[in-house]
UniProtKB/Swiss-Prot annotation:
It is found in: Secreted. Residues 1-16 form the signal peptide. Keywords: Antimicrobial, Disulfide bond, Fungicide, Plant defense, Secreted, Signal. Its main location: secreted. This is Defensin-like protein 219. Disulfide bonds join C68-C85, C71-C90, C75-C92. The keyword Transferase does not apply. It comes from the Eukaryota. GO terms for biological process: defense response to fungus; killing of cells of another organism. The keyword Ribosomal protein does not apply. Belongs to the DEFL family. One of its GO terms (cellular component) is extracellular region.
Length: 98
């Protein structure tokens, strides 16, 4: 009879401990989720920045560099060296990379 009483008492204590622990963890998660939503709800524009300046495109030199980088990656995937990258034409060598 004593063992049943002790077992039930321990079961109640353990279950109440886990219930408090679960509630605390869920409150922390809810708080962090709500903070996360408020952080990413929309970026506030600075008064010193003109919104028209935010979406400036790439210059032609930047576009050539980006194209040549993509060309180099393409050649490397084929296990070839890059022969040349001019006027939006990508050429890889015939020899394999050693």
């Amino acid at each position: 009879m004593k063992t049943i009483f002790v077992f039930l008492t321990l079961a109640v204590l353990v279950s109440s401990f886990f219930k408090k622990l679960f509630l605390r963890a869920s409150n922390i998660m809810i708080k962090s989720i709500s903070e996360g939503k408020s952080q990413f709800s929309g970026p506030a524009l600075s008064p010193n920045i003109d919104p028209a300046d935010e979406h400036i495109g790439h210059s032609p030199e930047d576009m050539k560099i980006i194209f040549c980088q993509q060309c180099a990656f393409h050649c490397i995937e084929k296990k070839k060296n890059i022969a040349h990258c001019e006027n939006s034409i990508c050429r890889c060598t015939l020899e394999d990379i050693l």
